[in-house]
Structure formats: structure tokens, C-alpha cells
């Protein structure tokens, strides 16, 4: 089965608390092979990304309503689309699930005026680097990004400008 058979569902259509609990319960599956330890993975799933900021998050569901992947993200006040986390179940990796989730996020973000999308990865995270390159994101080393000695790589992709809103014709 391909990623095209999946249904992307925005968090706003789901029970935020139940979804967060479900994804956290399966985090060892979704994050298998990640360079992040379990505490770091759990910390990515702050409740605010499900409750208050869930409008940009999405889960990819199989025809059997199983979770295949998900994305947590937000657009900041200065119009930067920030990917907090993207994870794909190992059974679905390599099928375009992350690409579909990220493209959905980018389209939503551009629609509200975001100029760029950004994610942060650990140096040497080959999976994140490959996905970023596939999507046209540029990597930039960020020494001390997460504190002294906690270097990261910032992955940035420019987003297309949303078409300007045309004012209504006052004669109509």
C-alpha cells in the first residue's frame, strides 16, 4: 500500500488528549532508529501541540484507521512554520508518508502567510537530512542551539508566497 491510500486528518478533527496518549503509548515504535532518547521523544509531545496549537498537526491514517505517521507543528507570529516533530511507523517508512505530512503542513502554513518552514535535527541524523534534502530544505549548523554543547542542524525551506487577497469590489 502506498502513502496515497492514507487519509491525512488534522488534529482539530480528533480528540487531542486521546490522540496524544495513543501516540505517546506507541512512541518506541514510531521513533525506532531515532538518535533521540525516550525522554527527548516524550518531551516533543507537549500537550500544547495537541490542544492549543493542533490546527497545523496531522495524523496519517490507514484504511483500517491505524496510525501510519504524524506531524506536530506551528506557525509563529513572525510567520515561521516550525516542525516540532514528524514520525512515521517503521512499516510505512519509505512510502512518502513524511513527505505528504510535511507538504500538507507547508501548504497550511503558506496559506496563513508563513515565509519559511524550519525544523531542527541532531547533527548526524541521516534520516532527517535525507528528508530535508528531498523537500528542498537547506541545512545550517547551529552550535549551542539547544544550550552549551548541544549543537543542532537547522533545516530551512522557503515557502511560496500565498496569493494576495483581493479586496471586494465595492460596486457588487
List each language-model region with its residue ranges.
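Residue-level recognition of strand-loop junctions within catalytic nucleotide-signaling folds
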Residues: 73, 158-160
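A short, internal acetyl-CoA/4′-phosphopantetheine-binding micro-motif in the GNAT/acyltransferase core
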Residues: 86-93, 121-123
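Short hydrophobic/aromatic beta-strand or adjacent loop that forms the aromatic wall/cage
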Residues: 55, 150-156
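Conserved N-terminal entry element of GNAT/NAT acetyltransferase domains
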Residues: 1-21, 160-172
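Conserved GNAT acetyl-CoA-binding A-motif
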Residues: 109-121
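Conserved active-site alpha-helix within GNAT-family acetyltransferase domains
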Residues: 99, 123-141, 147-150
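Conserved acetyl-CoA-binding loop-helix of GNAT-fold acetyltransferases
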Residues: 88, 94-107, 130-134
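Acetyl-CoA-dependent GNAT
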Residues: 10-84, 89, 102-104, 145
